[in-house]
């Protein structure tokens, strides 16, 4: 059991660590947080603070260890899931890394939807998703090209075999062979379309940011905006709808779950859209 004295000492050590961190003395900060953990090991912030220091030093193994411990103590730690996701991405564990970043994003949106961390997490999640897609897309493209070449070679061999069995080639046989090659080209062109970036549909994009929705909300006038963008507009420009000019109270903004689900479905099928504007 941690005594009150030990808890107070741990808090002072945490403050020492925070001061060292601000001065970019990450080694000293780690030492302070480590002492705090020794005195009071069940405080998640000590573990996430130390993990942040390890992250600054790019010691990703220790980042992962500290974040996992923090999550054991409190499962809804935005910072712990976020840094764990980054650590896993560094280990090329894209699937698990993306999963942790998505968890951090969901938690962040619930606790502080307009906070800086939500934007930061989204940016990292987008990069991770796009990077994962690039790797998969490159492999898929190579496989398609390899298969296409094999199919073309097989058709050409069949054409040569057919010609060897007859003394003279007919126009019909030549035309049939050409049509088979064209059909093959169409099939593989269609298969490659999945990985070809196109324009994102307008209804999935915010009229303010001109980017695909992340956290869409609908105004009383029926127009959907990105939550952070419309809140910033209401705060800095005025409490009115930027399109209809009708007055808006931030409390009247409602999550547009239908658009959010549509965006999720679109991104699931078109991962390249994480990096595209509208």
From Swiss-Prot:
Q: Which signals induce this protein? A: By abiotic stresses such as chilling, heat-shock and salts (selenate and NaCl).
MF terms from GO for this chain are: protein-folding chaperone binding; ubiquitin-protein transferase activity
Top enzyme category: transferase
Sorted UniProt keywords? Coiled coil, Repeat, TPR repeat, Transferase, Ubl conjugation pathway
Pfam families, per database record: TPR_16 (PF13432), TPR_8 (PF13181), U-box (PF04564)
Q: Name one GO biological process term.
A: response to abscisic acid
Q: Which reaction does it catalyse?
A: S-ubiquitinyl-[E2 ubiquitin-conjugating enzyme]-L-cysteine + [acceptor protein]-L-lysine = [E2 ubiquitin-conjugating enzyme]-L-cysteine + N(6)-ubiquitinyl-[acceptor protein]-L-lysine
EC number of this enzyme: 2.3.2.27
Q: In which pathway does it act?
A: Protein modification; protein ubiquitination
- Coiled-coil region list: 143-194
Task: Cite the U-box domain residue spans from the record.
Answer: 199-273
Q: Where are the TPR repeats?
A: 10-43, 45-77, 78-111
Instruction: Please indicate which superkingdom the organism of origin belongs to.
Output: Eukaryota
For the keyword Coiled coil, the answer is: yes
| SUPFAM superfamilies (alphabetical) | RING/U-box (SSF57850), TPR-like (SSF48452)
Task of the protein: Has E3 ubiquitin-protein ligase activity and may target misfolded substrates towards proteasomal degradation. Regulates the activity of some serine/threonine-protein phosphatases by E3 ubiquitin-protein ligase activity. Required for responses to biotic and abiotic stresses such as auxin, abscisic acid (ABA), low and high temperature and darkness, probably through the activation of serine/threonine-protein phosphatase and the subsequent modification of the plasma membrane composition. Regulates the chloroplastic Clp proteolytic activity in response to stresses.
Q: How does it assemble?
A: Interacts with HSC70-4, PP2AA1, PP2AA3 and PP2A5, as well as with UBC8, UBC9 and UBC10. Also interacts with the chloroplastic proteolytic subunits ClpP4, FtsH1 and FtsH2.
Q: What is known of its domains?
A: The U-box domain is required for the ubiquitin protein ligase activity.
Question: This chain belongs to which protein, by name?
Answer: E3 ubiquitin-protein ligase CHIP
Native source species:
Arabidopsis thaliana (Mouse-ear cress)
Which gene name belongs to this protein?
Answer: CHIP
């Amino acid at each position: 059991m941690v005594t009150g004295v030990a808890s107070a000492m741990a808090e002072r050590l945490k403050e020492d660590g925070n001061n060292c961190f601000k001065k970019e003395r990450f080694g000293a900060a780690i030492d302070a947080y480590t002492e705090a953990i020794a005195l009071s090991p069940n405080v998640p912030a000590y573990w996430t603070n130390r993990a942040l220091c390890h992250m600054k030093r790019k010691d990703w193994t220790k980042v992962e260890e500290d974040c996992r411990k923090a999550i054991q103590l409190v499962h809804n730690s935005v910072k712990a899931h976020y840094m764990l996701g980054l650590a896993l991405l560094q280990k090329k564990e894209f699937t698990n890394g993306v999963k942790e970043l998505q968890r951090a994003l969901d938690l962040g949106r619930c606790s502080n939807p307009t906070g800086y961390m939500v934007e930061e997490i989204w940016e990292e999640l987008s990069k991770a998703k796009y990077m994962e897609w690039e790797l998969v897309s490159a492999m898929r493209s190579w496989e398609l090209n390899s298969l296409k070449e094999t199919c073309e070679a097989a058709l050409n061999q069949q054409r040569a075999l057919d010609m060897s069995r007859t003394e003279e080639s007919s126009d019909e046989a030549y035309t049939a062979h050409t049509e088979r090659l064209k059909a093959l080209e169409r099939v593989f062109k269609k298969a490659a379309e999945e990985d070809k970036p196109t324009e994102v549909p307008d209804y999935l994009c915010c009229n303010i940011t001109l980017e695909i929705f992340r956290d869409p909300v609908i105004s009383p006038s029926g127009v959907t905006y990105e939550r952070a963008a419309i809140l910033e507009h209401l705060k800095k420009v005025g409490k009115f709808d930027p399109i209809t000019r009708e007055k808006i109270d931030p409390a009247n903004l409602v999550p547009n779950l239908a658009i959010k689900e549509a965006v999720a479905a679109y991104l699931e099928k078109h991962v390249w859209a994480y990096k595209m504007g509208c």
